[in-house]
């Protein structure tokens, strides 16, 4: 079974230290909100408050029609486009694209991740430079409704 160290280069996310505490990716998801809150409290002045428990880097662009619920961190040069819906517990890395009508929940997007068109990314960790094709979905629900 692949471990976090097999799958990810932890130098490409603010959550590298947090993820290093775990063996498997799914182990990190249950406490992600607390991780983001702790990271948010340590961010430098380049990150600006954008709402309750939401921090956005000053070089990031967030469309006025995007909806963001905390805890959430949006990294440098990231782009959150029209109609994006971030439901909380989301860490969006540097140079990421959260596209139109994309929904994020309980996720870590490493730097340079692209979720550009009509994606649902929930309970997931996407590694450095990952790209989600249009209309793709990740979730923690199996079609037979049993636990993942």
Question: Where are each of the predicted segments found?
Answer:
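Terminal amphipathic alpha-helical/low-complexity segments used for targeting or macromolecular assembly
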Residues: 1-53, 58
């Amino acid at each position: 079974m692949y471990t976090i160290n097999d799958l990810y280069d932890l130098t490409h996310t603010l959550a590298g230290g947090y993820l290093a505490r775990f063996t498997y990716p799914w182990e990190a998801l249950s406490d992600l909100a607390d991780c983001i809150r702790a990271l948010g409290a340590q961010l430098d002045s380049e990150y600006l408050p954008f709402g309750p428990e939401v921090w956005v880097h000053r070089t990031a662009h967030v469309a006025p029609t995007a909806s963001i619920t905390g805890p959430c961190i949006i990294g440098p040069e990231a782009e959150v486009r029209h109609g994006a819906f971030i439901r909380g517990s989301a860490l969006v890395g540097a140079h990421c694209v959260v596209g139109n009508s994309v929904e994020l929940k309980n996720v870590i997007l490493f730097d340079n991740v692209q979720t550009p068109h009509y994606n649902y990314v929930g309970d997931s960790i996407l590694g450095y430079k990952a790209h989600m094709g249009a209309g793709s979905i990740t979730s923690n629900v199996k079609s037979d409704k049993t636990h993942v």
